[in-house]
């Protein structure tokens, strides 16, 4: 998921995608522990997606605070 795709999403969509990504990360870690994970690069990709989503959520929060002031 690219940052440009994330910027256009609403807060609710971002929260839903964050939840889905965290669930996927949990499942990937479980597969890795069981020795069944084939694509280990997917772990870092999902972590980076979560970071991008959190960054955009934070940016939206800051923008909302600036709009109030």
From Swiss-Prot:
GO terms for biological process, alphabetical: translation
SUPFAM superfamilies cross-referenced by the UniProt entry: Ribosomal protein L29 (L29p)
Lineage top rank: taxon: Bacteria
Keywords associated with the record: Ribonucleoprotein, Ribosomal protein
Any single Pfam family the record assigns to this protein: Ribosomal_L29
Keyword match Transmembrane: no
Family label: Belongs to the universal ribosomal protein uL29 family.
Descriptive protein name: Large ribosomal subunit protein uL29
Organism encoding this protein: Oenococcus oeni (strain ATCC BAA-331 / PSU-1)
Gene responsible for this protein: rpmC
């Amino acid at each position: 998921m690219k940052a440009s795709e994330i910027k256009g999403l609403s807060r609710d969509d971002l929260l839903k995608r964050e939840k889905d990504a965290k669930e996927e990360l949990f499942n990937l870690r479980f597969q890795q522990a069981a020795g069944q994970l084939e694509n280990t690069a997917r772990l870092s990709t999902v972590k980076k997606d979560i970071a991008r989503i959190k960054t955009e959520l934070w940016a939206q929060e800051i923008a909302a605070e600036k709009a109030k002031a």
